[in-house]
Amino acid sequence: MAKAATRSRTKRAKRTVVDGIAHINATFNNTIITITDRQGNGLAWASAGGSGFRGSRKSTPFAAQVASERAGRAALDYGLKNLEVRVKGPGPGRESAVRALNAVGYRITNISDVSPIPHNGCRPPKKRRV
């Protein structure tokens, strides 16, 4: 019986990126933070649900802050220094996610709101009756 050849794997060095973009998608139910390079290639991401918050606790500003810190720390391995922040959506975690990225140690160069605004497009959901 022939022996299987064992191949030693060399660990590939992570590329260094200085400038990046933090995409914050803040919905009413969750907050998702994705950190990319300038071309849009993903470096790190985190969400409030993936950070251990379930149910109604996912949609809190604190959950968005924790998720933002996790994504920010994961992207530090790439040597990221400057971040441009793009916020999308009406959720409660918009501002706290930006503050958390600032607290991690990034230099935030620009904050822009890229929420989709309909020019009288689809009919919105009906009002809630609680």
From Swiss-Prot:
UniProt cross-references to InterPro entries, sorted A to Z: Ribosomal_uS11 (IPR001971), Ribosomal_uS11_bac-type (IPR019981), Ribosomal_uS11_CS (IPR018102), Ribosomal_uS11_sf (IPR036967)
UniProt keywords, alphabetically: Ribonucleoprotein, Ribosomal protein, RNA-binding, rRNA-binding
Entry-linked Gene3D superfamilies: Ribosomal protein S11 (3.30.420.80)
GO BP term (any one): translation
Transmembrane segments: none
GO molecular function, one term: rRNA binding
Pfam families for this protein: Ribosomal_S11
Disulfide bond positions: none
GO cellular component, one term: ribosome
Cross-referenced PROSITE patterns: RIBOSOMAL_S11 (PS00054)
Record's subunit section: Part of the 30S ribosomal subunit. Interacts with proteins S7 and S18. Binds to IF-3.
Function description: Located on the platform of the 30S subunit, it bridges several disparate RNA helices of the 16S rRNA. Forms part of the Shine-Dalgarno cleft in the 70S ribosome.
Family label: Belongs to the universal ribosomal protein uS11 family.
Protein's name according to its UniProt entry: Small ribosomal subunit protein uS11
Taxonomic source organism: Alkalilimnicola ehrlichii (strain ATCC BAA-1101 / DSM 17681 / MLHE-1)
